Regions:
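GST-like domain detector, emphasizing the conserved glutathione-binding G-site
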Residues: 1-74, 88, 174-184
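GST superfamily/GST-like fold recognition
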Residues: 47, 52-56, 96-124, 129-135
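An acidic site on a long C-lobe helix of protein kinase domains
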Residues: 8-11, 33, 79, 102, ...
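Residue-level signal for nonpolar/aromatic packing positions in well-ordered secondary structure
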Residues: 15, 87, 105-106, 135-141
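Tryptophan-centric aromatic hotspots in well-structured domains and transmembrane helices
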Residues: 10, 42-43, 76, 84, ...
Length: 184
């Protein structure tokens, strides 16, 4: 409920902004700190998240499909590595991405947790390693990371039907599925 009206908020960055503003925490109200948080939140939403998501797809799910995916996997792993380098450079100057712990760190942290699966040596990014180690011990982060832990399978043992649902849909097939649901 926003201003007394029911409303859904979607997209991770928008959700984090809404919650942080509502709780008055992890999102500064004054410039230039606010803009710095927004820069790094949008950097995650437009860069780190999508690139890490592509690495995840090609490492965890693409092997279930025929074809050579090595170019794509290498491409996204390299981009993920480059983005960790960007983080490492800024974290050399400050403790957290925007200075103080913020929604920018909250948004970015989950995408760094999979570094081992992506065959990245986090120790080659000393500042990211320090940042990662500081965040992973926060009690709320630990509780959050435990949610759904037993359900994570990273593509192992996933059924063909689930793979089709997750990766072989387009706008037309989704529309047809919605129409079929309406008939029932």
């Amino acid at each position: 409920v926003i201003d007394g009206q029911p409303m859904s908020v979607f997209e991770s960055g928008a959700i984090l902004m809404y919650l942080a503003e509502k709780a008055e925490n992890f999102f500064p109200q004054q410039s230039p700190d606010r803009e710095r948080v927004l820069e790094w939140l949008f950097w995650q939403v437009g860069g780190l998240g999508p690139m890490a998501g592509q690495v995840s797809h090609f490492v965890n799910y693409a092997p279930n499909f025929p074809g050579d995916h090595s170019y794509a996997e290498t491409r996204y792993k390299n981009e993920y590595d480059r983005l960790l380098g960007v983080m490492d450079k800024v974290l050399n100057e400050r403790e957290f991405l925007a200075g103080d712990y913020s929604i920018a760190d909250i948004a970015s942290f989950p995408w760094v947790t999979a570094y081992k699966r992506y065959e990245v040596d986090l120790d080659s990014f000393a500042n990211v390693r320090r940042w990662f180690d500081a965040i992973k011990v926060r009690p709320a982060v630990r509780r959050g990371m435990d949610v759904g832990k037993e359900a994570r399978n990273f593509g192992e043992g996933i059924s063909k039907a689930s793979l089709k649902t997750m990766f072989q849909q387009d706008a037309k097939s989704i529309s047809e599925m919605a129409k079929a649901k309406e008939k029932n």
